[in-house]
């Protein structure tokens, strides 16, 4: 259904007193195209609730038993996508600009643009930078391909991933050495753990 058809279905159901559950995959706040639906429901005066979901990058990290932020490695995660047939990326949100940060990248909707992802990030992260491509993460048939910027394209091609995949890029994915967080250090106090 297109947007007009989706809204028409919700409007018709609301008119006869039915409750509607508009289910999205992942978290509706990230690439869910829910804002445009909510805007139309607001105009129509139809009330709604938004229930948070689990973002694909968080589900992938859990399935991989990894943390996407590690002390002295990366303390930031950038959630982004690349432009192909969808809406253009705003100025300054291209991979070359975002990659200059060195942050862990969670790149959605871009597995068919993997060549450009690799080409843009290799000069910034290095060919040996770890990459994970997560296919249908959190579904029973989820699968992962692990590699580096140098070899991930061949591995993804061999796996046959052509859609519904998330690309994670960053040193945190490679078992990097890191120092323990200060959060649980014996000499670190805070409101929930005052000094002894």
Which ranges hold each PLM region?
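Short beta->alpha connector loops at strand-helix junctions that form conserved
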Residues: 1, 52-53, 110
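A cross-family phosphate/adenosyl-ligand binding-site feature
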Residues: 1-13
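A contiguous loop/helix-start segment that scaffolds small-molecule binding in enzyme catalytic cores
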Residues: 5, 15-21, 33, 39, ...
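Short glycine-cluster motifs
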Residues: 12-84
């Amino acid at each position: 259904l297109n947007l007009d058809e989706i809204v028409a279905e919700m409007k018709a159901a609301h008119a006869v007193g039915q409750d509607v559950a508009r289910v999205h995959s992942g978290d509706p706040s990230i690439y869910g195209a829910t804002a445009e639906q909510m805007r139309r429901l607001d105009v129509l005066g139809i009330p709604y609730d938004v229930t948070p979901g689990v973002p694909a990058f968080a589900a992938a990290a859990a399935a991989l038993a990894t943390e996407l932020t590690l002390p002295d490695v990366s303390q930031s995660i950038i959630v982004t996508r690349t432009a192909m047939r969808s809406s253009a990326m705003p100025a300054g949100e291209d991979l070359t600009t975002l990659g200059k940060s060195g942050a862990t990248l969670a790149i959605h909707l871009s597995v068919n643009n993997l060549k450009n992802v690799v080409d843009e990030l290799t000069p910034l992260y290095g060919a040996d930078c770890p990459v994970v491509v997560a296919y249908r993460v959190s579904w029973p048939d989820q699968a992962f391909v692990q590699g580096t910027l140098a070899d991930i394209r061949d591995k993804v091609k061999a796996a046959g991933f052509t859609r519904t995949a998330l690309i994670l890029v960053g040193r945190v994915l490679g078992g990097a050495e890191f120092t323990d967080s200060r959060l649980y250090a014996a000499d670190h106090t805070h409101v929930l753990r005052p000094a002894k």
